[in-house]
Curated annotation (Swiss-Prot):
Coiled coil: none annotated. One of its GO terms (biological process) is isoleucine biosynthetic process. One of its GO terms (molecular function) is flavin adenine dinucleotide binding. It is found in: Endoplasmic reticulum membrane. Mg(2+) binds at D521, N547. The chain crosses the membrane at residues 10-30. Residues 470-550 are annotated as: Thiamine pyrophosphate binding. This is 2-hydroxyacyl-CoA lyase 2. The keyword Chloroplast does not apply. InterPro entries: DHS-like_NAD/FAD-binding_dom, THDP-binding, Thiamin_PyroP_enz_cen_dom, Thiamin_PyroP_enz_TPP-bd_dom, TPP-bd_CS, TPP_enz, TPP_enzyme_TPP-bd. Keywords: Endoplasmic reticulum, Fatty acid metabolism, Lipid metabolism, Lyase, Magnesium, Membrane, Metal-binding, Thiamine pyrophosphate, Transmembrane, Transmembrane helix. Binds 1 Mg(2+) ion per subunit. It comes from Bos taurus (Bovine). Endoplasmic reticulum 2-OH acyl-CoA lyase involved in the cleavage (C1 removal) reaction in the fatty acid alpha-oxydation in a thiamine pyrophosphate (TPP)-dependent manner. Involved in the phytosphingosine degradation pathway.
């Protein structure tokens, strides 16, 4: 009796153990079945005879989203998608460095308001893009980066160029995904492109492994052994590989929606707009700072310009908003911004940010009422309650907000003496610039004078691409873009090397525009080889190099403060001859032909109009124009 009683708990324990083990086994089998897509394969078959490949799905989504250009540096991991894009009429433009491909996609995104797309190969191909992707993140550009990768089954097994690419790009991108099955290409890309444009725009990354892009017969050849297995373990491995292959391609070619998903764009509430209207209606000296976000869709640049003109508030323009009001508009002021901000009683930061560009908010007066509007809450409130405090903070689309302000302030007028005060200060500063242009320099040409002549020569249909430090910083004061979305600079990241990529994207987007690139000689070193790209693809752009044989923006502070010019010196290199060696046209400006600056610029224009990329190597001296210009 005791034995039977004692055996009961033991049997109960054993049966529980069996149930637990059985449940664990079932769960493991179900999990394996799910990972291998066994249930999905019951309803969706594999077309083993098809020669189609995943690159076709990639191209179809890009085409459905209106993508016209794909920038790349070729690699075996991504060949199928490049070929498929070409077949669908998407122009594939190959560069000499991957970073240029992403910069070009960035330019397309900024100028069109759509997603710019670049595709690069795995490993080093992707790591070469990191700077450009980070620049796009900080500049809030919707860029889609497509990256090749090792086959799904070979990742983490020592495959060629296989690294954890998702971990690398997750901090840089709004959306990161690795496609594991061909059928997932389309929905993943649609989600990525929507994410790039929703909220605060930014870059997104989609990883496309080899076996997802290549056709079934090629993947099968590499993945599943041709000889039938003999041993039990070999059969198990063969079964696993065969089902992995089937899962990759099951349902691959079934029709799916390919077009754009709805975007989520934040908007100011009517209550917020009304509070801002009331603040502005009481202003005596209002001022607007308009930044790049104001030019984002859905508000067109023309509609925004009309709204700003109707408001009648004096404004400063920055980033992509430069040129919004054209040249010499009575509401647009370019000089003495710091002094104007101190005097204004109401300041509207319309996409402008209180980072180093506004001295972290210290340029704002404590007595001013500050209205700040931005899609990104963190950026909107940066350094607030330290050096400045907003009266009204609006998280929403900037362009739409400005248009709504007009509706609430229709008929509002501000005293003309405020704008006149700002205009007089502008004119005094510009007179000082004219005087600096006449000052002699120790050697070569005065850069201030050269840039004034560039300003006088620049056509109305031009797009300005700027890439450099000292020379470009001087140009920002002297050269005016002729309209909105006609000034391309790196943005707040201050990246050198954007020039060739930005010029490439700009000329493709606006083939009827003249693309003028202003380079420092240091920055031009990054872009020189891409004149091979311009020549091969017949893309006529014009590069003006302010060649002062040095990293002058750094030198002008390093030498007086630290007593050494170490690492700041370059040479008066014959960049125009290097460009000629790549098949472009090259021209030289120096003191020997300083009376022909305009003629040489006109000659360069003519070369471009005839279809040739041109480099004008302008030997310049040094001035004190930008002493004390380094931001900390």
């Amino acid at each position: 009796m005791e034995t039977a009683v004692a055996a009961a708990p033991a049997w109960g324990f054993f049966s529980s153990f069996l149930l637990l083990a059985f449940g664990t086994l079932v769960a493991a089998l179900l999990g394996a079945a799910h990972r291998l897509g066994l249930f999905y394969q019951l309803m969706h078959k594999v077309d083993t005879a098809s020669t189609r490949h995943g690159g076709e799905n990639v191209a179809a989504v890009l085409k459905a989203h209106g993508v016209r250009f794909l920038f790349t540096l070729v690699g075996g991991h991504i060949s199928p998608l490049l070929v498929a894009c070409e077949k669908l009429g998407i122009r594939v433009v190959d560069t000499r460095h991957e970073v240029t491909a992403v910069f070009a996609a960035d330019a397309v995104a900024r100028l069109t308001g759509t997603v710019g797309v670049a595709a690069v190969t795995a490993g080093p191909g992707l790591t070469n893009t990191v700077t450009a992707v980070k620049n796009a993140q900080i500049a809030q550009s919707p860029v889609l980066l497509l990256g090749g990768a090792a086959s799904t089954l070979l990742q983490n097994r020592g495959a060629l160029q296989a690294i954890d690419q998702i971990a690398l790009f997750r901090p840089l991108c709004k959306f990161c995904a690795s496609v594991r099955r061909v059928r997932d290409i389309i929905p993943t890309l649609r989600a990525a492109m929507a994410a790039a444009q929703s909220g605060t725009p930014g870059p997104v990354f989609v990883e496309l492994p080899l076996d997802v892009l290549y056709p079934y017969f090629m993947v099968q050849k590499e993945m599943v052994p041709a000889k039938p297995p003999k041993g039990l373990m070999s059969r198990a491995v063969h079964w696993y590989l065969a089902n992995s292959l089937a899962n990759l391609f099951a349902g691959a070619w079934e029709p799916q929606p390919e077009g754009p998903l709805p975007l989520d764009i934040p908007q100011a509430s009517p209550q917020q707009v009304q509070r801002c209207v009331e603040i502005l209606s009481r202003a005596k000296k209002p001022l607007m700072l308009i930044g790049s976000q104001a030019l984002l869709p859905p508000t067109s640049s023309d509609k925004l310009r009309v709204a700003v003109e109707t408001l009648g508030i004096p404004c400063f323009l920055a980033g992509m908003a430069r040129g919004l009001l054209g040249r010499n508009h009575p509401l647009h002021f370019r000089q003495n911004r710091r002094a104007a901000l101190k005097k204004a009683d109401v300041v509207v930061l319309a996409g402008a940010v209180c980072d180093f560009r506004l001295s972290y908010g210290r340029v704002l007066s404590r007595s001013s009422k500050i209205i700040v509007v931005n899609r990104d809450r963190k950026e909107m409130l940066i350094n607030s309650d330290i050096f400045w405090k907003p009266q009204e903070a609006v998280q929403g689309d900037v362009g739409s907000f400005v248009v709504k302000l007009v509706e609430g302030l229709r008929g509002q007028m501000w005293a003309s003496d405020w704008a006149e005060e700002l205009r007089q200060a502008d004119q005094q500063k510009e007179q000082a610039f004219r005087e600096k242009a006449l000052m002699p320099v120790a050697q070569h040409l005065n850069p201030v004078r050269v840039l004034q002549l560039v300003e006088d020569t620049l056509p109305d249909n031009s797009i300005l691409v700027v890439d450099g430090g000292d020379f470009v910083g001087t140009a920002a004061y002297l050269v005016q873009p002729r309209g909105p979305l006609r000034w391309l600079d790196p943005g707040a990241f201050g990246t050198l090397g954007v020039g060739a990529g930005f010029a490439l994207g700009a000329k493709l987007c606006r083939p009827d525009a003249e693309v003028w690139c202003l380079f420092g000689d240091g920055a031009f070193g990054y872009s020189l080889i891409e004149f091979d790209t311009f020549v091969r693809h017949k893309i006529p752009v014009m590069a003006l190099i302010g060649n002062d044989a040095g990293w002058t923006q750094i030198s002008r502070e390093q030498v007086p403060s630290l007593g050494s010019n170490v690492a700041c010196g370059l040479a008066y290199t014959d960049y125009h001859k290097a460009a000629q060696g790549l098949g472009a046209q090259g021209l030289l400006l120096s003191r020997e032909n300083e009376d022909q600056v305009v003629k040489v610029l006109r000659d360069a224009q003519q070369w471009c109009q005839d279809g040739h990329p041109v480099v004008v190597n302008i030997l310049i001296g040094r001035t004190d124009f930008r002493d004390g210009s380094i931001a900390m």
